[in-house]
Amino acid sequence: KNNFDKASRNIRVQLGQKDRFRKGIERSGLYLAEIKRILKQYGLPEELSVLPHVESSFQIGAYSSAGAAGIWQFTRSTGRLFMRVGYDVDERRDPILATYGAAKLLKRNFESVRSWPLAITAYNHGLQGMKRAQKKFGNDFVKVVEKYKSRTFGFASQNFYAEFLAALHVVKNQNKYFPNLVIKKPINITSFSLPEYIGVRTAMDFFDMSRDEISKANPSLRRPVLNGEKRIPKGFHFQAPAEKVSNLVARYGQIPQKVKYGSQLSSKWYTVRRGDTLSGVALRFGT
């Protein structure tokens, strides 16, 4: 009885997770094959492809109170170690580009601690924290969870690996738990690395795409680019649905040189001075 009482105190229930998980499985079809391919490319087990279920339920627009973004929930600081995170482009928001970053991070974690429970927990808690825990308790993950003390090693980090295992079990038995799933099919995308900077209006005109279509096909493009304040950067891998745009390279060749640029538009910055008000600054810049 005492063991059951002790176990019951470690159980926490969240309502509404079943429907959220079902939708996540259905959404995952858009990206799962490519995610598994990337993990294999980095020599990682394909089971890691369920981590976005834990992090975001495969919602590309997911954004946490801590500033983590995208299906892999990279914070800005960690994201910058593995991908482009800036004012014009935020690759954390692109499911495929972020997967390359996640693969690099997970590979680094595992090569450092040589234990998947610790490496996966490090994805949430941070590698240095897990290395400190490993130094005290070795690879005994149960001891790490029960005895490792750190201000930041709270409920979420302690249970992250358990959530991963639960998600893996559900995904492997998805038809049992979720009959009649409607899995979304991958979108056939064509992409092209831009040799110069171009404006979003130019892209709309010559690639025959609406602003919304460009945004959906290129989720890493941020609002300043989409509203014309910034240009689509040189070297950016512009993406379009293959059935919509058959040959991006040929279409790019039709763009006049006068609307291709060698540099980005400068940002409009204003230093707030004593006595300024928000409405006054907005009026100054017409916003």
What do these predicted ranges mean?
Residues 62-82:
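Short, surface-exposed glycine/acidic/tryptophan-bearing loops
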Residues 45-46, 76, 211:
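Alpha-helix N-capping/helix-start residues
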Residues 60-62, 224-225:
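A short, acidic/glycine-rich surface segment
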Residues 45-53, 69, 116-121:
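Alpha-helical scaffolds flanking conserved acidic
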Residues 1-37, 41-42, 81, 85-112, ...:
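Extracytoplasmic and endomembrane cell-envelope/extracellular-matrix remodeling and assembly machinery
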